[in-house]
């Protein structure tokens, strides 16, 4: 059966950014708006391994998790019709970063450290990197270290104080501008 081709600015979009910026929620809605499939990389890894992300960190360590992420990215960049929501640290890997930047538009989502903390605390057990005495300071430190890499994304959108629909609308507009600039 032939796939119905509809006008869309991209057939593979990656969402990156720090934990708690809204990549998963926004990714689902963006995929719906663009009529693409949605994959949350963390959930994908959990399904493949049968182990939750916190348990992977706890029992196998961060290094093992990063290897799993890299392998999953390598596999998924070969897919089409996909919005891929990365884990907060996935884009830090140079190999994954290069593959994703070359595959299609990468959208970096941003939020303030305070917003990130508030959102992350809604699911405290799911955020292994924040199991520290001062999580806000940890967020600031990690965000400062990761920001130069997130800035390599093609498109940047703030999620602070905004509804998901608003953010998705802005991303779609910027994806069309990005496609036009590239002559697609």
UniProtKB/Swiss-Prot annotation:
Cofactor(s), by name: Mg(2+)
The protein's superkingdom reads: Bacteria
Q: Which cysteines are joined by disulfide bonds?
A: none
Report residues binding substrate: 42, 66, 88, 146
Location comes to: Cytoplasm
PROSITE patterns xrefs: SHIKIMATE_KINASE
Q: List GO molecular-function terms, semicolon-separated.
A: ATP binding; magnesium ion binding; shikimate kinase activity
Its EC number is 2.7.1.71
- Gene Ontology terms: biological process: amino acid biosynthetic process; aromatic amino acid family biosynthetic process; chorismate biosynthetic process
**Subunit composition?**
Monomer.
Q: Which HAMAP family match?
A: Shikimate_kinase
Please give the name of this protein.
Shikimate kinase
Natural source organism:
Thermus thermophilus (strain ATCC 27634 / DSM 579 / HB8)
Taxonomic lineage? Bacteria, Thermotogati, Deinococcota, Deinococci, Thermales
């Amino acid at each position: 059966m032939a796939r119905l081709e509809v006008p869309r600015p991209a057939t593979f979009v990656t969402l990156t950014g720090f934990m708690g910026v809204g990549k998963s929620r926004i990714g689902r809605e963006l995929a719906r708006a663009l009529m693409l499939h949605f994959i949350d990389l963390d959930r994908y890894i959990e399904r493949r391994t049968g182990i939750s992300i916190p348990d992977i960190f706890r029992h196998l360590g961060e290094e093992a998790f990063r290897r799993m992420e890299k392998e999953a990215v390598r596999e998924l960049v070969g897919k089409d019709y996909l919005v891929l929501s990365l884990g907060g640290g996935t884009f830090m890997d140079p190999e994954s970063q290069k593959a994703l930047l070359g595959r299609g538009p990468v959208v970096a989502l941003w939020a303030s450290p305070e917003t990130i903390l508030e959102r992350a605390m809604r699911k405290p057990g799911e955020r292994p990197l924040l199991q520290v005495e001062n999580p806000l300071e940890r967020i600031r430190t990690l965000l400062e270290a990761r920001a130069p890499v997130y800035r390599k994304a093609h498109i940047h959108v703030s999620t602070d104080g905004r509804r998901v629909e608003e953010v998705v609308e802005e991303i779609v507009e910027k994806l069309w501008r990005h496609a036009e600039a590239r002559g697609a």
